[in-house]
Amino acid sequence: MTASLTTKFLNNTYENPFMNASGVHCMTTQELDELANSKAGAFITKSATTLEREGNPEPRYISVPLGSINSMGLPNEGIDYYLSYVLNRQKNYPDAPAIFFSVAGMSIDENLNLLRKIQDSEFNGITELNLSCPNVPGKPQVAYDFDLTKETLEKVFAFFKKPLGVKLPPYFDFAHFDIMAKILNEFPLAYVNSINSIGNGLFIDVEKESVVVKPKNGFGGIGGEYVKPTALANVRAFYTRLRPEIKVIGTGGIKSGKDAFEHLLCGASMLQIGTELQKEGVKIFERIEKELKDIMEAKGYTSIDQFRGKLNSI
């Protein structure tokens, strides 16, 4: 009995649910091509701003024993660079599954302008609005301000008619899950992506008695194994609170087939990999696909839908 990882997401069919997390291995067209030619089921572009950004000073990304700390500051080549890439790829590979396109403006107005550009283009993929970057000095995470989140989405959906998801920060309180889900349920969202890195962690080099990343006096977003329990909780919380039409993408701490299975069991439809992709490169997708299939076959599952979201309580 062979397990199939075929994943239906919105109106698209992907060979498996795995993709990169925006920010990892997607800065240049070369990296995007490597993702497109890998075993990943889908891929997403680097979060784009209006103009090219260099991001924060280095060192700004460090691998640590159980994950990573980063304070990248949204370095990217600007929206025109990525839009040109995806439009060319659509034209050259018309039968390929839909591409994900990420945007992350520095203000509501910039986000609206970025989304207008996508709305007015021939892009026929899926857009992800990043409401949760924790690493831009002086710019708070929009999605921790519930009123601002609602205002942003009201303005977005006044004109944006293409499939749109939002990338969320981690939440830690049931009241916050409830409030955010109530807001999100008011809009025709395609999905939520939980979670972005846990913001403003601190990692210390004891030998040097110093922080390890330069920006923000060493404070940075934490990813990898450290964040998996929080990621699973957010996936589960939103899966059980959102309208069934709003899918959940699970991101955080996925480095094995077991991790992937747990995210799917909590209700995730697609899975994004960040820290471990940074460490292993695109070959991770082949490994993790095999590991997930092995788990499913050992349990007698032939498709992900047989267990997705069916987490047992005790």
From Swiss-Prot:
In what way is its activity controlled? The activity is independent of the presence of oxygen.
Where exactly is the Glycyl lysine isopeptide (Lys-Gly) (interchain with G-Cter in ubiquitin) cross-link placed along the chain?
K46
PROSITE patterns linked: DHODEHASE_1, DHODEHASE_2
Record field: catalytic activity: (S)-dihydroorotate + fumarate = orotate + succinate
User: Which cysteines does the record link by disulfide bonds?
Assistant: none
Q: Which domain of life is it from?
A: Eukaryota
Q: Which HAMAP family match?
A: DHO_dh_type1
Q: What does this protein do?
A: Catalyzes the conversion of dihydroorotate to orotate with fumarate as the electron acceptor. Molecular oxygen can replace fumarate in vitro. Does not use oxaloacetate or NAD or NADP as electron acceptors.
Protein name, per record: Dihydroorotate dehydrogenase (fumarate)
Q: Which organism is it from?
A: Saccharomyces cerevisiae (strain ATCC 204508 / S288c) (Baker's yeast)
